[in-house]
């Protein structure tokens, strides 16, 4: 049996998104979430939240966007926090840890920036792996299963109240 030379896999880079990535990110989000994407309660949050590009990242492989995580500034009650989402990884790249890596990277950036907490709407089975737990006292601007409202705190702050504009 002869061994075939193979090309080294292109390195994965986590970088802040730029306007040049916008088209690829939109296409990835449409593939990942399908047509129901804009009916999610998280979209209602993003309508009033302030995008935080310095806390948001995309994963690039050979210049192609293969993952994205976006972060937004909001408040819960009077507490300023960060809202995470959308998070998506290209289907061919899943189950290699990239989703968790993107969340960790964005959370580390938020913590380094002095943010007290990150909240999101998602599956606890996935996000518990990266430090999130159900946030029972946080309410969303629309109907949602309360078991999907999650938070990860970096400080001992009360997370009680509605998610609203920062
Ligand atoms: C969720 C997502 C970002 C994970 O990306 P990823 O790169 O595969 O993540 P990781 O490799 O870090 O983790 C994969 C593990 O999470 C599990 N997982 C993925 N989505 C999950 C979910 N919704 N609920 C529970 N577990 C989930 C996978 O089965 C896998 O489990 P395993 O390690 O036991 O095989 C990716 O599946 C995706 O883009 N999904 C579509 C968009 C989406 O649902 N985004 C999250 C919205 S809140």
Model regions and ranges:
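Short, low-complexity, intrinsically disordered N-terminal peptides in bacterial proteins
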Residues: 1-13
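A conserved beta-turn-beta hairpin within the catalytic core of GNAT-like acetyltransferases
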Residues: 74-84, 94
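Conserved active-site alpha-helix within GNAT-family acetyltransferase domains
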Residues: 112-116, 121-146
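A short beta-loop-alpha structural element at the N-terminal edge
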Residues: 12-25
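C-terminal "cap" of GNAT-fold acetyltransferases
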Residues: 140-166
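Hydrophobic adenine-recognition pocket in adenosine-nucleotide-binding enzymes
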Residues: 17, 87-89
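Active-site rim helix/loop that mediates acceptor-substrate recognition in acyltransferases
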Residues: 22, 30-73
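Conserved acetyl-CoA-binding loop-helix of GNAT-fold acetyltransferases
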Residues: 89, 95-108, 120
């Amino acid at each position: 049996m002869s061994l075939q030379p193979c090309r080294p896999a292109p390195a994965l880079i986590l970088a802040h998104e730029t306007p040049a990535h916008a088209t690829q990110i939109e296409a990835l989000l449409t593939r990942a979430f399908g047509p129901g994407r804009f009916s999610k309660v998280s979209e209602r949050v993003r309508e009033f939240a302030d995008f935080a590009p310095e806390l948001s990242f995309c994963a690039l492989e050979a210049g192609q966007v293969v993952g994205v995580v976006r972060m937004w500034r909001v408040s819960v009650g009077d507490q300023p926090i960060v809202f995470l989402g959308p998070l998506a990884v290209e289907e061919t790249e899943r189950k290699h840890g990239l989703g968790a890596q993107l969340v960790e990277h964005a959370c580390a950036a938020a913590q380094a920036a002095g943010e007290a907490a990150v909240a999101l709407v998602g599956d606890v089975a996935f996000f518990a792996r990266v430090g999130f737990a159900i946030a029972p006292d946080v309410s969303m601007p629309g109907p949602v299963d309360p078991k999907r409202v999650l938070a990860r705190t970096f400080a001992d702050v009360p997370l009680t109240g509605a998610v609203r504009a920062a």
